[in-house]
């Protein structure tokens, strides 16, 4: 029988209702300023900032606490070039052959295309992989539970942490992303989930004039 090991919840802090409203509003007012950026400066970012953001991502809840994620941080110029070439190859196929007209129409307001200069311009790329199973040092395979949901939550925390640090990001998902396994030498049990582009915005960076749905459109109270 497995022994359950529990410890007291000591770090929880309760706030007054008024303080909770203030804190939640402050967080919303800050996070709503976050924007997806496609034009990056090549200004360097302290590596410790990236590490701290990844530490935050690693606190995410996961199925059975198995933490089925792997983050690969890329700053090497040659590797970024390889990733760009791999991504643009898939994106060219997507825009010219694979994507249905409805999808391309939906993308038009965002001004996207198969050219991905940001993959070389930004100081950091983080390739995020999900694990369908983990492999112990002795070769034993351990099934992972809810890997996609778990990794998605971790990515959300990571994106919020990056914004909180004063940086901008872009979620990039060329399909398929198998080329990342080859370029980054990742094992078969790791599947590319997301490529996150991170850095400072270019001085002339522009973003689409888009709006988010309001609360009534996305929430039902029962």
Enumerate the predicted regions with their spans.
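A glycine-rich helix N-cap at a beta->alpha junction
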Residues: 92-99, 185-207
């Amino acid at each position: 029988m497995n022994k359950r090991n529990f410890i007291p919840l000591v770090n929880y802090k309760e706030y007054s209702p008024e303080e909770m409203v203030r804190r939640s509003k402050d967080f919303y007012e800050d996070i709503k300023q976050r924007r997806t950026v496609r034009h990056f400066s090549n200004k360097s970012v302290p590596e410790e900032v990236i590490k701290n953001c990844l530490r935050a991502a690693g606190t995410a809840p996961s199925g059975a606490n198995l933490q089925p994620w792997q983050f690969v941080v890329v700053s090497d110029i040659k590797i970024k070039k390889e990733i760009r070439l791999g991504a643009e190859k898939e994106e060219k196929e997507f825009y010219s052959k694979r994507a249905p007209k409805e999808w391309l129409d939906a993308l038009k307001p965002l001004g996207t295309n198969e050219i991905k200069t940001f993959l070389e311009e930004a100081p950091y790329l983080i390739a995020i992989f999900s694990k369908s199973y983990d492999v112990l040092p002795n070769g034993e395979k351990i099934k992972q539970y809810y890997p996609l949901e778990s990794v998605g939550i971790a990515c959300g925390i990571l994106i919020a942490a990056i914004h909180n640090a004063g940086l901008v990001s872009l979620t990039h998902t060329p399909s398929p992303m198998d080329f990342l396994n080859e370029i980054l030498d990742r094992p078969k049990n790791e599947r590319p989930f997301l490529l996150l582009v991170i850095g400072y915005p270019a001085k002339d960076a522009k973003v689409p004039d888009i709006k988010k749905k309001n609360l009534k459109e996305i929430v039902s109270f029962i």
